[in-house]
Amino acid sequence: MFLLYEYDIFWAFLIISSAIPFLAFLISGILSPIRKGPEKLSSYESGIEPIGDAWLQFRIRYYMFALVFVVFDVETVFLYPWAMSFDVLGVSAFIEAFIFVLILILGLVYAWRKGALEWS
């Protein structure tokens, strides 16, 4: 039988861990001075006035490369628990993981052909 009172500690932890950052922002907003001047509104670059355009734009290739990295990083997060319990899960879990890896390999081939992995 599923009993909700068994999760009291979980809910208390969730509420407290959600309230701490909120309270930190609230208290810092209340205690901080509200003085806006030219120094406050200027760009800060290691204590030195910025020279030239302070806004640097990255090329789109970097974003594509980072996106492919994130996809395969998430793949590792999903496959690690599967690898740790491989002997317990059986053949059906192996087939599911194989299909998952196959889809990711197809995505890698697609990204490779589209040039997402070319840095130049």
UniProtKB/Swiss-Prot annotation:
Name where it's found. Answer: Plastid, Chloroplast thylakoid membrane
Q: Which UniProt keywords apply?
A: Chloroplast, Membrane, NAD, NADP, Plastid, Plastoquinone, Quinone, Thylakoid, Translocase, Transmembrane, Transmembrane helix, Transport
Domain of life (superkingdom) = Eukaryota
The protein's Enzyme Commission number:
7.1.1.-
According to the UniProt entry, where is the signal peptide? Answer: none
Q: Name one GO molecular function term.
A: quinone binding
The membrane topology term of the UniProt record is: Multi-pass membrane protein
What does it catalyze? Answer: a plastoquinone + NADH + (n+1) H(+)(in) = a plastoquinol + NAD(+) + n H(+)(out); a plastoquinone + NADPH + (n+1) H(+)(in) = a plastoquinol + NADP(+) + n H(+)(out)
Listed transmembrane segments: 9-29, 64-84, 88-108
UniProt-listed Gene3D superfamilies: NADH:ubiquinone/plastoquinone oxidoreductase, chain 3 (1.20.58.1610)
Q: Please give one Pfam family short name.
A: Oxidored_q4
Identify the GO cellular component terms for this protein.
Answer: chloroplast thylakoid membrane; NADH dehydrogenase complex
Keyword Protease included in the entry's annotation: no
For the biological process aspect of GO, one term held by this record is: photosynthesis, light reaction
Regarding protein family, the annotation reads: Belongs to the complex I subunit 3 family.
Functional summary from the UniProt entry: NDH shuttles electrons from NAD(P)H:plastoquinone, via FMN and iron-sulfur (Fe-S) centers, to quinones in the photosynthetic chain and possibly in a chloroplast respiratory chain. The immediate electron acceptor for the enzyme in this species is believed to be plastoquinone. Couples the redox reaction to proton translocation, and thus conserves the redox energy in a proton gradient.
Q: What HAMAP family does the record point to?
A: NDH1_NuoA
Q: How does it assemble?
A: NDH is composed of at least 16 different subunits, 5 of which are encoded in the nucleus.
Any idea what this protein is called?
Answer: NAD(P)H-quinone oxidoreductase subunit 3, chloroplastic
Q: Which organism does this record belong to?
A: Aethionema cordifolium
